[in-house]
Amino acid sequence: MISKPDKNKIRQKRHRRVRGKLSGTADRPRLNIFRSNTGIYAQVIDDVAGVTLASASTLDKEVSNGTKTEQAVVVGKLVAERAVAKGISEVVFDRGGYLYHGRVKALADSARENGLKF
């Protein structure tokens, strides 16, 4: 019998491949996204120092109830505001191996509208 492909393993493989080609610096940190079944998490990471500079997720109090896409828009806004407050205006977007569609696209568009350039 043919086994069904594990979508998460395929995504992780895609993410490893992309991460080999991009990394965040102090000048232009990496905006990383993790999407779970229930929430979405975003971090601005300086890979050289190995430090998270700003983060936001659906676990934050500012994120109210709504659809997952609406929550992703709020998370994008929060992470952009927190990054801009720390003097970060340009980032490298790391979609985490996910397709640029739906919640990932909503978060990215919201972050762009609130001051991040990528």
From Swiss-Prot:
Complex formation: Part of the 50S ribosomal subunit; part of the 5S rRNA/L5/L18/L25 subcomplex. Contacts the 5S and 23S rRNAs.
GO-annotated biological processes: translation
GO cellular component: cytosolic large ribosomal subunit
Gene: rplR
Free-text function comment from the UniProt entry: This is one of the proteins that bind and probably mediate the attachment of the 5S RNA into the large ribosomal subunit, where it forms part of the central protuberance.
InterPro entries xref list: Ribosomal_uL18_bac-type, Ribosomal_uL18_bac/euk
PANTHER family: 39S RIBOSOMAL PROTEIN L18, MITOCHONDRIAL, LARGE RIBOSOMAL SUBUNIT PROTEIN UL18M
Name used for this protein in its record: Large ribosomal subunit protein uL18
Region (Disordered): 1-24
This protein's UniProt keywords: Ribonucleoprotein, Ribosomal protein, RNA-binding, rRNA-binding
Protein family membership: Belongs to the universal ribosomal protein uL18 family.
Gene Ontology MF term list: 5S rRNA binding; structural constituent of ribosome
Biased composition (Basic residues): 10-20
